[in-house]
Regions:
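Short terminal hydrophobic/aromatic SLiMs and anchors at protein ends
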Residues: 9-10, 20
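Small-residue-biased structural context
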Residues: 15-255
């Protein structure tokens, strides 16, 4: 019978047959003195957040705190956003929230919106149009319709609600004023459910189109759409776990 053994050292844990050892990567801590490059390689998805903070590549062996200071980014906020983005179970506490800069957070969220609207959607549309044209009348208009619904739902929330209602309200609070016509609890109940539109679109791309219609392009665009959807979900988590409770603290501090 194969024997199992547990070995512990400073870098790895193993639990495996004596002739087969499984090595598990030690998790990089989300801390100020962690090397910035190590944090990025811990979760590659964090790389796409850097332009939203105005942080470029070429950070060498500098720490998170050093890179943030160079780029005039609040270090606590940067680490908090990375932690929420990477670990959906993480919820910062009141003391942690009070250390961040809300102006930096709004700038980050607005930059995320520009990324979605100016880069991701145009990229997807360019490639999706080739597939729509190849589908013919049976599936092309339907695929285009579900994509348009998906995009409009996203735009309705981030461009017309967050940019025109929520963010101006928060900026008013930061200016020391309070309006009785709105509070942040309304924001919690206004996240749109776009999953149905996304499911319909993905069903056409993956299940119902004939297999010989641009299969490689369909796989690539499906991955792009799923990546965007995942990013948007994590964006919502950042708003729910950081923005909303922080603004609640501001509201409660107002007379």
């Amino acid at each position: 019978m194969t024997s199992f053994r547990w070995r512990e050292d400073t870098k790895i844990h193993t639990f495996a047959p004596s002739n087969y050892i499984v090595m598990l990567k030690k998790k990089t801590p989300f801390m100020k003195d962690t090397k910035f490059a190590e944090l990025m390689t811990e979760d590659r998805r964090l790389l796409q957040l850097l332009p939203r903070f105005g942080i470029g590549l070429g950070f060498g062996d500098r720490s998170v705190a050093q890179v943030c200071q160079t780029n005039q980014v609040n270090t606590e906020l940067f680490l908090m956003i990375c932690e929420v983005y990477s670990n959906g179970r993480y919820r910062p506490g009141k003391e942690e929230l009070q250390k961040i800069d809300l102006g930096n957070l709004l700038s980050y969220l607005k930059a995320s919106h520009r990324y979605y609207l100016d880069e991701r959607f145009p990229h997807i549309e360019e490639h999706l149009q080739h597939i729509i044209e190849a589908c013919g009348k049976k599936y092309g208009p339907m695929l285009g319709h579900f994509y348009d619904e998906y995009k409009q739902e996203v735009m309705r929330h981030i461009q017309y609600y967050e940019e025109e209602v929520v963010f101006p309200y928060i900026e008013t609070l930061l200016g020391g004023q309070r309006t009785s016509s709105y509070n942040i609890n309304e924001f919690e109940h206004n996240h749109t459910n776009i999953q149905d539109c996304l499911d319909d679109m993905m069903n056409i791309l993956l299940k119902y189109l004939p297999g010989d219609i641009l299969p490689k392009e369909r796989i690539e665009i499906s991955l792009d759409i799923m990546e965007l959807s995942d990013d948007l979900n994590r964006h919502s988590l950042i708003e729910d776990r950081i923005l909303t409770p922080y603004v609640e603290l501001l509201e409660n501090a107002q007379p």
